[in-house]
Amino acid sequence: GELVMAAGLTPYSVEAMSCFMAGTKCEQTFLRKTEEEGFPETMCSYHRVFLGAALTGILPKPNCMIYTNLACDGNMMTFPYLKDKFECPGFYIDVPYEKNRESVLYVADQLRKLKRFLEETTDRRISEETVRSAVDNSRKAAANYKKQLALRCAHDPVTSLTNELYALFMCHLMAGSETAVTYTEKLLRDVRMSPRGDGLSVIWMHIMPFLQEPVKDIFNYSKKMHIRACDFIADGFQEMHAEDPYEAMAEKMVYCIYNGSVKQRVEEAERLARITEADGAVLFAHWGCKGTIGASSLIKQSLEKTGLPTMILDGDGCNPANTSDGQVSTRLQAFVEMLEKGKEEKQA
C-alpha cells in the first residue's frame, strides 16, 4: 500500500470490488460468467465475482496489477490470468515462508524493484522522501491503532460490520496515506469517548460477512455484542521496526500472520483476546478459503485450550447462495447463549 500511495495511484482490490458488487445484488451474473470460463466453484467467491466482472467488461483495464502469495491462494490464479487477458503489466511479490532477516531483505529488494516498476508504468518519478513519508504514516497509524486496542477492554463503541471493514481499507489499500492516519486518530478518539458495554465481546478472525442478515442482526449497532478486535485488521496495523523504509514494508509482509504456520494466527488471537478481555472468538471460514478452512479446527482447539470459547462460522462473504441464513442464525444465537451462560458463571 505504501508504495502505491507514494506513486499517487488509486488502488482497488479483489475483495473490496467484489464486496461492492455483491452489495448491489448483481454478483450472480458475474459468478455465472466465471463458471462459463471454467473456473471451479470451489474457488474463493471474491475472486470468482471479480473475474466475472472483468470478463464481462464491467471493470476498466487497470494501469497495472500488483499481487503476492500472501493470505489468499486465489491470487495465483486470478492475477496471472487477468494480466494476460488485459495485456496489462503486472508485478508479483514473492514472500518466503520463513520469517527471518534474510526473508525481509529478499522482499525489501523486490519492493525496490516495485518502485522502479511503478515509475515506468506511470511515467512518474517517486522520490525516496515520498516513500519514507508513506512509511512514516503507516507507523503513526499503527501507533494509534495500538493505543485504541489497549482501551478496548473498558470501552465499547457501538459500531457495525461495515464500519469494521473500513479499517481494512486503511491498513491495506490505503496504507501509508494521510487518510489512514486521520482514520486511526478518529478511531482512537471515538474509543476513548465510548463507555464500557454491558454485553458480550468477541475477537473476530478473518474477513467479515457484512451482507449476511443474521450476522448483521447480532452485531450491527448492538449494545449486547461487541467486536473488540479483528486479527486481519490488527495484523495490517502491525508495528514496523526497521529504519529503512523498504525493509519496514518487507517486515510487515514477512511477519504477516497469514504467512507461515497457523500457530501465528492462534498466538495473535490469544494476544488480542488478552488485551481486550474478550469473552469469546468467532472464526469466519469463508467459502473457498482453503487456508482458513483447513486450519479452522486447529485454531478452535488451540484457543479453547486457553479458555477462550471459539465458534467456527462457515459461510460466504460474497455469495449469499452458498449460505443458509437460518442455519447461521441458529448457530450464532446458540453461541451467544453459551457466552452469556459462561459470563454469568464467572460472575457468580
Language-model regions: role of each:
Residues 1-2, 69-75, 205-212, 287-294:
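Gly/Ser/Thr-rich loops at beta-strand to alpha-helix junctions
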Residues 3-29, 203-274:
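Redox- and metal-dependent alpha/beta enzyme cores, enriched for Fe-S-associated oxidoreductases
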Residues 37-55, 257-271:
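Glycine-rich, highly charged phosphate/nucleotide-binding loops
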Residues 48-120:
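Acidic/His-rich segments in extracytoplasmic proteins that coordinate ligands and/or metal ions
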Residues 260, 266-306, 311:
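C-terminal hydrophobic structural anchor segments
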Residues 297-348:
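Peripheral docking tails and interdomain loops at the edges
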